[in-house]
A protein has these predicted regions:
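Local cysteine-cluster metal-coordination motifs and their immediate loop/turn environment
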Residues: 17-30
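C-terminal scaffold of the Radical SAM
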Residues: 2-10, 30-54, 61-328
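Short active-site neighborhood of thiol/selenol oxidoreductases, capturing the structured segment around
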Residues: 12-15
Length: 328
């Protein structure tokens, strides 16, 4: 890759819509599928990458690549390597030595060999979807890993040489208390070495998800396992103060980083930087044009990525309104 220093910063998002089992709260475009489907999807994804008109990116520098899902670590590591080879070759003129390249991983789905392949492919940042250090809470929201699974994956990551590791956490989970939330934060901050970055999100019960239906059914029977708004707010404020005491600084609503370890990709969104997306349901926001791919995996594999959907031309007023909103 060329070490470029372009004036315009660009982000890239790559969507891998597969997982071993969909979590109860997830409303993202994702599904469990066979390796046959995985391979066909990866082939279509690489076709989309290679079909992008890279000539229109003159003057840009690719500052970040984020491989999300789904669970990207649920597909063969060789597929991830193929994707990164396509990115580095097709976008060679805008890739730089300091490009941040992140892959989302589910604890328990990574091996030492997978991590070696990721590093060889140029990936330099991992994001683990832990959510909780309490096994009963993980089971309640349909996560397939345990706290011990996470600790093993975290150890393997550092043994493989990854020094930039994010840990995703969630609060206001069913049956979660302030005490168990405090325990999760304490256990994560006690890891050696500490994560360079922690994200803490309040659970949102998205309509149409199994967890939302379950909670609604329980509430109809007079059972409410969710925290009230005051407790939710208290959990958030506790995370802010506790993580500050552990050396993290908050640079965005849900993100906390050690000094100089902020996520470039996260900052790009909050600073309204341009980005391009590849994969099913992936969106692009470049210039005055915003568009996305189909949400249908089969249609995407069949070549629907060639015809973008929901195309929107933004005015200067639209961009100013968005900038003000994101800055609130």
């Amino acid at each position: 890759m060329m070490n470029t220093d372009k004036n315009k910063q660009l982000g890239m998002y790559i969507h891998i819509p597969f997982c071993i089992r969909k979590c109860k709260y997830c409303d993202f475009v994702s599904e469990a599928a066979s390796d046959f489907v995985h391979e066909n999807y990866i082939n279509a994804l690489i076709d989309e990458i290679n079909g992008y008109d890279a000539g229109q990116l003159e003057g840009y520098g690719l500052r970040s690549v984020f491989i999300g899902g789904g669970t990207p670590s649920a597909v063969k590591a060789e597929y991830i390597s193929r994707i990164m080879t396509a990115v580095k070759e097709h976008f060679a003129d805008i890739c730089g030595h300091f490009t941040e390249i992140t892959i989302e991983c589910n604890p328990g789905t990574v091996t030492a060999e997978n991590l070696r392949i990721y590093r060889d492919a140029g990936i330099n940042r991992l994001s683990f979807g832990l959510q909780s250090a309490i096994d009963s809470e993980l089971e309640c929201i349909g996560r397939i890993h345990t706290w011990d699974d996470f600790k093993n994956s975290y150890r393997l990551a550092h043994e493989a040489g990854f020094k930039n590791v994010n840990v995703d956490l969630m609060f206001d989970l069913p049956d979660q208390t302030m005490d168990t939330w405090k325990r999760t934060l304490a256990d994560v901050c006690a890891l050696e070495p500490k994560p360079s970055h922690i994200s803490a999100y309040s659970l949102i019960l998205e309509e149409g998800t199994p967890l939302a239906a379950q909670i609604e059914s329980e509430r109809e029977r007079g059972i409410d396992r969710m925290a009230d708004e005051d407790t939710d707010r208290a959990m958030y404020h506790y995370a802010q103060s506790y993580l500050a005491g552990e050396g993290y600084h908050q640079y965005e609503i849900s993100n906390f980083a050690m000094p100089s370890m902020e996520s470039i990709h996260n900052l790009s969104y909050w600073e309204c930087k341009e980005y391009i997306g590849f994969g099913v349901a992936a969106a692009s926001n470049k210039g005055d044009l915003r568009c996305r791919n189909t949400y249908d995996i089969d249609r995407y594999i069949a070549g629907a990525w060639q015809n973008k959907e929901d195309i929107e031309h933004l005015t200067g007023r639209d961009r100013m309104s968005e900038f003000v909103f994101l800055g609130l």
